[in-house]
Every structure is written in structure tokens, then in C-alpha cells.
A protein has these predicted regions:
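Histidine-centered metal-chelating micro-motifs
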Residues: 52-54, 73, 89, 93-99
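Short, conserved beta-strand element in jelly-roll/cupin
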Residues: 46-47, 57-73, 112
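Short strand-connecting beta-turns/loops that link adjacent beta-strands
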Residues: 39, 60, 104-105
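Structural motif
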Residues: 71-73, 80, 96, 106
């Protein structure tokens, strides 16, 4: 097995039932860490109906959201964009953004961040 000091053996199996870790964020939203290292973060997240995250940006992180279930609305300084199931949206560094679930069903999506967002989130009041 190839391993880097401090990392799990690769490859390793992860799923919603067997994530690296689970967390609650925002207004009762769920997140499951699937890949979590300084170079790359991959998360599965769930937002209940009528929830939204805070407007924010990342100094150096590029993100890609891929919608699995439901429809997301992204608000950015460039406007509003609806992204439906089986569609994705890239967010470049320093772009103010937030994701909303304005629908009547749970929103589920994969979120890839490169590098990791740890220490790189600036919340806008």
C-alpha cells in the first residue's frame, strides 16, 4: 500500500454511510467528508428545503458543485443561476457566492474544492 505520512492507505472506500466524518452546518444541513486533505476536499452535502448558506468567498480555492438531487440556486456577484440534478457549476477563487435550496425537496450535491477550504473562507455579513 502506498501511503503518505499521516494519510489513510490509498485506495480506501468511503460513502455516506462510511465517510471520513459527518458534520452539521448552516440551518440543519448535513455534510459528509469523502476526501479531506490540504490539496483536495470532496464532500457530499444535503440541504433541507428552504435553506441557504451565508454569502462568502474563498481567497484561493476553486470549487465545483455537482447536483445529485433537487435544484440549487447560486447567488453570485454576477447574478442568480439555477443548477438542476446532473448539472454542475464551477466557482472561481474570490467570487462571492452562496447556495440556496428554494425547492420543496432535499438538495444533495457533491462539492469538490481545490485546495481545501480550511482557513480560506471569508464570510460576508
Amino acid at each position: 500500500m502506498n501511503t503518505v505520512s499521516g494519510e489513510r492507505p490509498s485506495p480506501h472506500f468511503v460513502s455516506r454511510e462510511h465517510p471520513l466524518s459527518h458534520y452539521i452546518w448552516g440551518d440543519q444541513c448535513d455534510g459528509w467528508n469523502l476526501v479531506d486533505n490540504p490539496e483536495l476536499s470532496v464532500k457530499l452535502e444535503r440541504m433541507p428545503p428552504h435553506t441557504a448558506e451565508q454569502l462568502h468567498f474563498h481567497q484561493r480555492v476553486r470549487q465545483f458543485f455537482f447536483i445529485l438531487k433537487g435544484a440549487a440556486v447560486f447567488e453570485t456577484e454576477e447574478g442568480r443561476t439555477e443548477v438542476k440534478a446532473q448539472q454542475g457549476l464551477e466557482i472561481r477563487p474570490q467570487l462571492r457566492h452562496r447556495i440556496l435550496n428554494e425547492g420543496e425537496e432535499d438538495l444533495e450535491f457533491i462539492l469538490c474544492s481545490q485546495p481545501s477550504t480550511i482557513g480560506d473562507r471569508v464570510t460576508i455579513e
